Amino acid sequence: MDKNTLVGFALIGAVVIGFSIYNRPSQEEMARAKHYQDSIQAIAQKEAERLAQAATAQSQNATLHLDSTSMFYGANQGTEQLTTLENNVVKLTFTNKGGRVCAAILKDYNGQDGKPLMLFDEKDSGMNFAFEGKNENILTEDMYFQPTNVTDSTVTMRLAANNGGYIDFDYKLLPDAYMVNFTIRANGMQNFFPPALNTVNINWRQRARQLEKGFSFEQRYTSLTYKPVEKSSDYLNEMKEAKEDVTDRLDWIAFKNQFFSSVLIADQDFDKASLTSTPQQEGSGYMKNYTADMTTFFDPTGKQPTDMQFYFGPNHFKTLLNSNDLSLSQKDLELEDLVYLGWPIIRWVNRWFTINLFDWLSGWGLSMGVVLLLMTIIVKVLVYPATYKSYMSSAKMRVLKPYINEINAKYPKKEDALKKQQETMALYSKYGVSPMGGCLPMLIQMPVFMALFFFVPNAIELRQQSFLWAPDLSTYDDIINWGTNIPLLGNHLSLFCLLFSITNILNTMYTMKQQDMGQQQMPGMKLMMYIMPVMFIFIFNGYSSGLNYYYFISGLIGILTMVILRKTTDEKKLLAMLEARKEKKSQKNGGKPGGGLMAKLEALQKEQERLQQERMNKGKK
C-alpha cells in the first residue's frame, strides 16, 4: 500500500468520525429513543413466549398422537436398565435404551488414573439403527428394549411391537477374547416393512478418549480406519478434520486410538459409508470425534439374520491376528493392520523379524528397557557385516588420501575440475576402490533400523512400563519440564531425546573425521550433518522415550564399533594390500585400464570430456 492510499484512508476515516459526532442526538433524544425501544422489546418478548408455549403444546399433542398410533408405542417410554457381560479380559455394559453397548472396560490395562482402562462410556458413544417401514420409520436410539436371555456372556435386547412382532439384538461375548457376536433378526414384522426392503441404516458415533500422557504424540496414531473388501486398509487424516464418502464396500470400520480400538465388523459388508473424524482440543480429555454412517444387509422376514461383530480391545498385533480366526464370515479380516508397522518392505521386516524377536526376549521376564537393549545389540550384530564393509570402504579411501591431495594440488583451478575428477576416478580404478562402496551396505541396513522406528511407538507392551528415570516407555520422559509451551519444543525436555542427539553429534563428528579426504568443496553438506542432530531435539522431544532410548543405545554402539574398528585396522597393511592389488591388476591387463564399474565411469568421463571439447571447438568457429 503506497503513501497516497494511506493518506486517503486516513481522510475518509476523519470525515466519517466527524460526521458521526456532528449528527449525534442529544441526551433527551437518546433517553426517549431508549424508552421506546425497551417498550417494543417487552411486547416482542411477551409475544415470543406466547408463541413458544403454543408451539410446545401443539408439539406435545402431535407427539402423543404419533406415539399412540405407532407400532412401537410401548417402546417409546420406559426406564433405563443396564446389563453387564464379562469374561477374563473385558467387561461390557449394555443399556436397554437403544439396545446397545454403552461402556467397555479392558481388565488387563490401566488408564492414567491407575484404574482398569475405560475405553468409552455412555456419554462417549452412540449407535442408532434406522429401519424403514411402510408407514413409519424405526429409530432405535431412543427406544426401550427388553433384556432377555441374560447370562454372563449373552443378552438379547428385544424391541417389541404392538402386534406381537419384535426385533431382536442378540449379543454374545466370546470366551477369553475381545470379540462380541452381534445379530439382528426380525420376527413377525413382515407387514410392517415394505417387501423390497433389504438394508438397514447404521449411525455409529464415539468420542475417542485421551488415554495416554502425550496428546500430540497420541494424536498421530489416533485415526478412523477402515478396510475395503479385498483391499488394504485405509484411514482418514489424523491431524485435521476429515470426511470421506467411501464408494467401496467395507469389511470393517475402526475407531482407533494409539493402543486401543473399537471395531465394527460386517458379515455381509458395509455399503454407502460416510466417515467423519474431527480432532479435539488438547485439555478436553478427548482426541477425536468419530462418526460412521453406512448400510448393511437386513432381511425383514427374519429368515436370514444380520450378522456383525464388535472388537473392543488392544492394538496388539498377535491378539488382532488371532481375532481374525473368530470371524463369522470365515474371511481374513486383516485386523492386524490396526498396528501400523511401516511401508511394505519395512512392514515385512517388522512382522516376521522384529515382533518375533521382541516376543522371544519379552518371554524371559526381563524389563522392557533391557529387552530394547538386547534387541538393539542383536540388530547391530546382524548388520555388522554390512557395517564392516562400509567402514573398510571408507578406510581404503582414507589411506589413499595422500594421492588425492596430490591430484588436488595438481589441479587447483575451477576450470580443471573435470580433469581433476577424471584423474581421481582413474586412481580409484587402479587401486580397485569404489567411492560408492560404502553406500550399498548402509542402504541394506536401513530397513532394519527403520523397522524399529515404526515398531516401538506402536508396541503396546511398552505402555506404562518404566525404565531408569522414564515412568512410561510409550510416551516422553519429561524429567525436565516447565509451565510455558515453547514453539517446536513444548513444555518439557526429554532426557533420552537429549542423549540420543548428543550421541548423534559425536557419531557425526567421528564419522566425518574418518571420511574426510581433504575435499573442501562441500562445506554446506558438513554443516548440515551437524545441524541435523540438533534438529532431532525438536523433532523427537515429544516422541516415546522407548524410541529415543533405542536410538541413543544404537548411536552409542555405533560409536564404539567405529572406535574398535579404527583401533584394529592396520592402515599401513591396508595400503600395502591396495598397492599389491594395483600391481597385480596392472600386470594382468598389460598396463591398460581394468574393467569393472570404475573403468566404465572413467570411460564415461572421457566421453564427456570429448563432447565438451567438441562443443568448445564449434563455438570458436
UniProtKB/Swiss-Prot annotation:
Gene Ontology biological process terms from the UniProt entry: protein insertion into membrane; protein transport
Where is this gene product found? Cell inner membrane
Alphabetical GO CC annotations of the entry are: plasma membrane
Where are its TM segments located?
A: 1-21, 363-383, 436-456, 486-506, 527-547, 549-569
Entries under Gene3D superfamilies matching the protein: 2.70.98.90
Q: Mind listing the GO molecular function terms for this protein?
A: membrane insertase activity
Q: How does it sit in the membrane?
A: Multi-pass membrane protein
Record key words, sorted: Cell inner membrane, Cell membrane, Chaperone, Membrane, Protein transport, Transmembrane, Transmembrane helix, Transport
Return the similarity comment: Belongs to the OXA1/ALB3/YidC family. Type 1 subfamily.
Function of the protein = Required for the insertion and/or proper folding and/or complex formation of integral membrane proteins into the membrane. Involved in integration of membrane proteins that insert both dependently and independently of the Sec translocase complex, as well as at least some lipoproteins. Aids folding of multispanning membrane proteins.
**Listed PANTHER family:** CYTOCHROME C OXIDASE ASSEMBLY PROTEIN COX18, MITOCHONDRIAL, OXA1
Subunit details: Interacts with the Sec translocase complex via SecD. Specifically interacts with transmembrane segments of nascent integral membrane proteins during membrane integration.
Q: What is this protein called?
A: Membrane protein insertase YidC
